[in-house]
Amino acid sequence: MTDKSDRTDWVALMRAIRDHRDEAAFAELFQHFAPKVKGFLMKSGSVASQAEECAQDVMATVWQKAHLFDPSRASVATWIFTIARNRRIDGLRKDRQPEPEDLFWGPDSEPDQADVYEMQQENARLGRAIARLPEAQRALIERAFFGDLTHRELAAETGLPLGTIKSRIRLALDRLRQHMS
C-alpha cells in the first residue's frame, strides 16, 4: 500500500504555485510539509512555538519565492528543508547577537563644576601653547583642526607640497605635546 505523499507530484504543485498562484496546490503542499518542517526544527533544538512560527515563515517563503524553485537542481522537499535550515541558522545568529546596552534617553546631566573648571584650564593652556608655535605651524594647525580642512585641502590652498604640510603639522603637534606636558 502506498502513501498519498508517494503519489503526489510535488514538482507539478510547485509549478502550479509558481505559474498560476494556485492556492489549492499550495494548501496541499502546506498540509504535507509544514508539520514535517516543524518536526525538523524541533529536532534541531527549537521549542515548539519557535518551530511553529519558523515553519509558517518557511511556507510563506515557499509561496513568495516559488518562482526560484528549479526542479533540475533539487527536489521540492530538499528546497523547502534548505529554506528551513537557513531560517534556523538565521534565528540562531540573531539570538547570539548581544543586546545593546540600555541607553538613557533624555537631557544630559549637568557636568560637574570641577570638571568644567578643569576643562577651561586645559583649553587655556592649549591656547597659550598654540600661540607659542611658529606662525607657519600655528596657521596650519588652526586650519587643520579648527577649520576642518584636510591636508590635501591645505596643500591646495597654500600651494605647499602635501609632504611639507604633513611635516609642519607633525612638528607642531610634537611642540604642543612638549608644551602641554
Curated annotation (Swiss-Prot):
Location of region: Sigma-70 factor domain-2: 29-96
Motif (Interaction with polymerase core subunit RpoC): 53-56
Gene Ontology biological process terms in this record: DNA-templated transcription initiation
Region (Sigma-70 factor domain-4): 129-178
Stored Gene3D superfamilies: 1.10.1740.10, Winged helix-like DNA-binding domain superfamily/Winged helix DNA-binding domain
DNA-binding region: 151-170
PANTHER family, alphabetized: RNA POLYMERASE ECF-TYPE SIGMA FACTO, RNA POLYMERASE SIGMA FACTOR SIGZ
Subunit structure: Interacts transiently with the RNA polymerase catalytic core formed by RpoA, RpoB, RpoC and RpoZ (2 alpha, 1 beta, 1 beta' and 1 omega subunit) to form the RNA polymerase holoenzyme that can initiate transcription. Forms a 1:1 complex (via sigma-70 factor domain 4) with anti-sigma factor ChrR; this inhibits the interaction of RpoE with the RNA polymerase catalytic core.
Family as reported in the entry's similarity comment: Belongs to the sigma-70 factor family. ECF subfamily.
Biological role stated in the UniProt entry: Sigma factors are initiation factors that promote the attachment of RNA polymerase to specific initiation sites and are then released. Extracytoplasmic function (ECF) sigma factors are held in an inactive form by a cognate anti-sigma factor until released. Sigma-E controls a transcriptional response to singlet oxygen, a by-product of photosynthesis; its continuous activity requires constant exposure to singlet oxygen. The regulon has about 180 genes that protect against or repair damage induced by singlet oxygen, including itself and rpoH2, a heat shock-responsive sigma factor.
Domain observations: The sigma-70 factor domain-2 mediates sequence-specific interaction with the -10 element in promoter DNA, and plays an important role in melting the double-stranded DNA and the formation of the transcription bubble. The sigma-70 factor domain-2 mediates interaction with the RNA polymerase subunits RpoB and RpoC. The sigma-70 factor domain-4 contains a helix-turn-helix (H-T-H) motif that mediates interaction with the -35 element in promoter DNA. The domain also mediates interaction with the RNA polymerase subunit RpoA. Interactions between Sigma-70 factor domain-4 and anti-sigma factors prevents interaction of sigma factors with the RNA polymerase catalytic core.
Protein name: ECF RNA polymerase sigma factor RpoE
